[in-house]
Amino acid sequence: MIIGDCCNFGEYNHLTAFKSIKIGNGVLTGRWVTISDNSHGETSLEHLKIPPAKRLIYSKGEIIIEDNVWIGDKATILVGVKIGENSVVTKDIPPYSVVVGNPVRIIKNI
């Protein structure tokens, strides 16, 4: 895990690195943020039928959070995510959605 200069993390943040998490300079997080490059299973319907505690730990890559990113309260950043510099998410994302891109678009509903 690499954390840049002048980062501020809110209360009760949870960071876990199985492979790699890179956080740039000047990153700000709210409270209760989770940043984890691993999960209990893949994002497929088959794996979702298995209770999370019984799934094998899975990681498909790293997390990169570039400079000057603001992550609000209760956000969850998972494996394979890259957040470009100076980014802030300002719109709702529907439940059970996988989103990508800038602007964000839904690529999968699970």
Language-model features: where?
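Flexible, glycine/small-residue-enriched loop-and-beta-strand segment within the central core
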Residues: 1-79, 110
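C-terminal/domain-terminus segments
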Residues: 76-109
